[in-house]
Design a protein with these regions (language model features):
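Post-DEXD/H (motif II) to motif III coupling segment of the RecA-like Helicase ATP-binding lobe
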Residues: 405-406, 410-411, 418-468
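Conserved helix-turn-beta segment of the N-terminal RecA-like "Helicase ATP-binding" lobe
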Residues: 95, 345-370, 379-382, 468
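Conserved pre-motif I regulatory segment
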Residues: 262-310
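Acidic, Mg2+-coordinating catalytic module of metal-dependent nucleases/exonucleases
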Residues: 121-206
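Conserved SF1/SF2 helicase motif Ia
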Residues: 310-315, 320-360, 442-449
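Conserved DEDDh/DEDDy metal-dependent 3′-5′ exonuclease domain
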Residues: 45, 52-128, 135-153
C-alpha cells in the first residue's frame, strides 16, 4: 500500500483524523516513510539556532546538530515542512542534491485553501504555532496542515487534480507533494481542454490558456484556485503576489480581457449595461447632447484603458469609475484606489454606495479615530474593499504603501482633478507625488496599472473623454 493510500485511510474528507491526532502508525509500516523538519535561524547572524524534527513513528528530534539530524532521517523518503524548500533545506543542506523528496506545505496552502476563511493554521506565509521558538511544535503544526491539504486534494475533482498536476509536477515547490499523493497529469485530454471544461462560464472561452500554461504555470494554478472561490473578498496572499507577480496578469487575461469574437462569459460579465443594472439598478447611462459620455468612459475603463474624462458638474462622473471598480472587484478580486481632495467628498461617496447596498467602498483619512482607521485598513487588507478613497497626502504613508503592495490594484483614479489643473496659493504639492508613486508601484510589482483622471468641466464644449 502506498504512503498516499495509508494517509487517506486515516483522514476523512474534512481533514480530521479518524484516529487520535498523534496515532499515525497505521499508515507508516511499509517502506515509505516521512518526517517533518523545522529550523530556527538567527535573525542577525543567519545561523542555525535550533533544529526540530518529527518522524512518522512519532520519534522526535530536538537539538542543534545537522549530523545527528541526518542519522534521524536515514530511512526517510519524504522530508516535509512549512517553507522547507527555500528555508529549512537551504540552511541544512545548502545547494547539495538530497535523496529525499521535499514536501512544502507553504506553497500548497493557497492553492488548496484559497477562499475565506483561509486555513486556520496559516496566516500570511507563517504557520500558527502554540509555542514560540519550539521547532518540534512547529513540526506538529506542519503535519496537521499537510494532512488537511492531502484531505482537500482528495476532495478535488479528478479533472482538477489533473490540471494542477499538469501545471506543477517537476516544479520544486510543488513536486514533493505531487509525488506523495501520486498525482498524474492527464495524457488523454489536453490541458487547455481540461481547464476550459472545469472553469466553463468562469473564464473567457477564448483566453490563450496554452501560452499562460507554458509561460506561467505556477501563476496559472494560483489564479485558477482564486477564480473558483465563491467569495469575491478572497484574495491572493501577499507573499504569493511577491513570488509570483504574474498571478495578477494571468487572472486578468482569463477574467477581464474581452475576447474579440465574444463568448458567454465576456458578453455578460464584462458588459457595462448589464452591470449597470446589476449594481445600480439603472437601465441606461446618461447622455449629453446625444453623446454617451458616461458609457464611453465606463466602457474604456472596463476595457483596461487609461483615460482622461471631463464632465459637467453633477454629470455622474463617479459612476464611470465606480462601476468598473465593482466589476473588477468581482472578476479579478482587484482594488481601485480613488485619490480625492476632500474628506467630506470621500465620505459622501462611500455613504452613497452604502445606501445602495454596496459595501465594497472604504475611506482611510485623518478624521478617523484609531479604531475606525484600523478597521478600514483591515477591510482593505482582507479583500472586503474593492474601492479605496484616500487623499494624495496618504500616498506618503508607509501603511498605505504596504497595504497597496499586498493587494491587486487595478486602477488609480484621480477624482476632482481640477484641483491641480492650475497653480495657486492653495495648490497641494502632494499631487505632484501621485505620478512618482504610481510609477514606483508598477516597477516594484512588475505590473501595468491603469489610471483614470476625472475633471469637472463648466461648459459642454469641455466635456468629453480621451484615452491615454
Amino acid at each position: 500500500m502506498s504512503l498516499w493510500n495509508r494517509i487517506l485511510d486515516t483522514i476523512n474528507i474534512g481533514g480530521a483524523s479518524s484516529s487520535s491526532d498523534n496515532d499515525i502508525s497505521s499508515f507508516t509500516r511499509d517502506a515509505d516513510s516521512y518526517a517533518f523538519v523545522d529550523v530556527e535561524v538567527g535573525v542577525k547572524n543567519h545561523k542555525i539556532q535550533d533544529i526540530g524534527a518529527l518522524r512518522h513513528d512519532e520519534a522526535t528530534f530536538h537539538r542543534n546538530s545537522k549530523a545527528d539530524l541526518l542519522d534521524f532521517l536515514s530511512d526517510i523518503d519524504f522530508v516535509c515542512g512549512h517553507n522547507i524548500v527555500h528555508h529549512d533545506a537551504k540552511f541544512l543542506f545548502g545547494d547539495k542534491r538530497q535523496r529525499w523528496a521535499l514536501v512544502d506545505t507553504l506553497y500548497m496552502s493557497p492553492l488548496l485553501f484559497p477562499e475565506r476563511p483561509y486555513h486556520r493554521l496559516v496566516k500570511d506565509d507563517k504557520l500558527m504555532s502554540d509555542e514560540i521558538n519550539n521547532p518540534v511544535n512547529d513540526c506538529e503544526k506542519a503535519r496537521e496542515l499537510l494532512f488537511d491539504e492531502i484531505a482537500h486534494w482528495r476532495s478535488l475533482s479528478e479533472r482538477r487534480q489533473h490540471i494542477y498536476a499538469s501545471l506543477l509536477i517537476g516544479i520544486e515547490e510543488f513536486d514533493g507533494f505531487m509525488q506523495m499523493v501520486g498525482a498524474e497529469s492527464n495524457a488523454n485530454d489536453s490541458l487547455v481542454e481540461l481547464i476550459q471544461a472545469e472553469f466553463y462560464g468562469k473564464i473567457c472561452a477564448n483566453a490563450d490558456i496554452k501560452t499562460l500554461a507554458v509561460k506561467y504555470p505556477c501563476a496559472l494554478a494560483y489564479a485558477l484556485a482564486l477564480i473558483d472561490t465563491t467569495d469575491q473578498r478572497s484574495v491572493t496572499p501577499a507573499w504569493v503576489l511577491y513570488n509570483y507577480p504574474e498571478v495578477e496578469y494571468v487572472i486578468r487575461q482569463l477574467r477581464h480581457t474581452r475576447c474579440a469574437v465574444g463568448c458567454e462569459y465576456c458578453d455578460r460579465q464584462l458588459d457595462a449595461r448589464y452591470n449597470l443594472k446589476r449594481f445600480f439598478g439603472y437601465d441606461s447611462f446618461r447622455t449629453y447632447d446625444g453623446e454617451p459620455l458616461q458609457e464611453n468612459a465606463a466602457c474604456a475603463a472596463i476595457d483596461g484603458k487609461s483615460l482622461l474624462a471631463i464632465f459637467p458638474t453633477g454629470g455622474g462622473k463617479s459612476l464611470t469609475f465606480q462601476l468598473p471598480a465593482l466589476i473588477e472587484g468581482g472578476s479579478v478580486h482587484g482594488l481601485t484606489v480613488v485619490i480625492s481632495p476632500l474628506q467630506s467628498l470621500m465620505k459622501d461617496q462611500v455613504d452613497n454606495l452604502a445606501d445602495r447596498g454596496i459595501t465594497d467602498a472604504v475611506t482611510i483619512n485623518g478624521l478617523l479615530d484609531p479604531i475606525s482607521r484600523s478597521l478600514a485598513i483591515e477591510r482593505v487588507q482582507s479583500g472586503d474593499a474593492s474601492l479605496l478613497y484616500i487623499s494624495p497626502e496618504m500616498l506618503r504613508s508607509k501603511t498605505i504603501e504596504k497595504i497597496l503592495m499586498a493587494r491587486h490594484v487595478v486602477r488609480f483614479v484621480i477624482d476632482e482633478a481640477h484641483c491641480f489643473s492650475a497653480w495657486g496659493q492653495d495648490f497641494r504639492v502632494d499631487y505632484l507625488y501621485i505620478g512618482k508613486f504610481i510609477k514606483e508601484y508598477q516597477e516594484r510589482k512588475g505590473v501595468d496599472t491603469h489610471t483614470s483622471v476625472v475633471f469637472h468641466g463648466d461648459g459642454k464644449a469641455e466635456s468629453g473623454s480621451r484615452y491615454m
